[in-house]
Amino acid sequence: MKALSLAVFVALTWVLDAQQTGALAQPGIKWTEDQLRQAVAPARVGRKLTPKSWPGNARVAVCLSFDVDNESYLLARGETSPTTLSAADFGAQTGLPRILGLLDRYQIPASFFIPAVSAIIHPEMIPAILKSGRHEIGVHGWIHESLAPLEESEEERLLKQAIDYLTKASGKRPVGYRAPAWAFSARTLGLLRKHGFLYDSSLQAMDEPYEIVSNGEPTGLIELAIDWTLTETPYLGRGGTMPSPELLYQLYKDEFDGAYEQRTMFVLTLHPHVTGHRAPMRHLDRFIAYMKSKPGVWFATGEQIARYLKNM
């Protein structure tokens, strides 16, 4: 009951924060030690899952992942400007075909996390992704909705809609999940367990795979952790801070080299409406070529990595 009360309190706080302009809300300064512990308890690090070896005695597992948002995140907040929507439509019309062509050239798999509405608007995308037989479809919300303000019943309804649509469109029930905007609510983890997901790829507590613990209980759910340094939108999206994709891909290379040395996992998250432009694609091409040049690199989908870890 205490945990539920805190979850409601936190959700209300987020809603109030969103309504404020210019005011910095700091509700946590008044929380008790008990409330602070409860606030962080829903999703914590459990067992580290980096194996002694990857398939084929590879040194590193590489998961290239793409969040295929397109117009969904704009539609979620009621944006209908044709100009604004056209910039997101670029992801389906141009970015995704370029990315699939690049992956075909290197014959490597990837995981595509798709808001169901994105696939509804662009029904040609899922068949194109699945054509090679190498790639995975994962859940990325219904309409790239913000989860925190939702009631649990509404969050579950949207999750079920997304699962059902993507299952029907792809012919296979997705086993991987990535939260819209990578932002869980206090209820999301419980819903993922309830609906039988194999793994999540939304959290950022480590740069290696781990089992998620919830309120002190091992969940059996595998986390393929991501990080804001390993995606392009903060740098190349609107309001981004990176002057050149070349600098961004140097960061990715250094992160990959570290994962290679540590014999663990490297997860890169990109967006077709951003990375699909000419300059980022040139650097992505060079980066994949660099990783392919190294011995002992296992390119895999999130599902392949998670199943390998599950069966250890």
Where is each model-derived feature located?
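Active-site clefts of carbohydrate-active enzymes
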Residues: 229-232, 264, 270-273
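Boundary at the C-terminal end of the N-terminal hydrophobic targeting segment
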Residues: 18, 23-25
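Surface-exposed cleft-lining segments at the edges of enzyme active sites
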Residues: 174, 235-245, 272-273
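Bacterial N-terminal signal peptides
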Residues: 5-17
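A structural motif
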Residues: 217-235
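Catalytic alpha-helical scaffold of carbohydrate-active enzymes acting on polysaccharides/glycoconjugates
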Residues: 27-176, 181-223, 246-268, 276-312
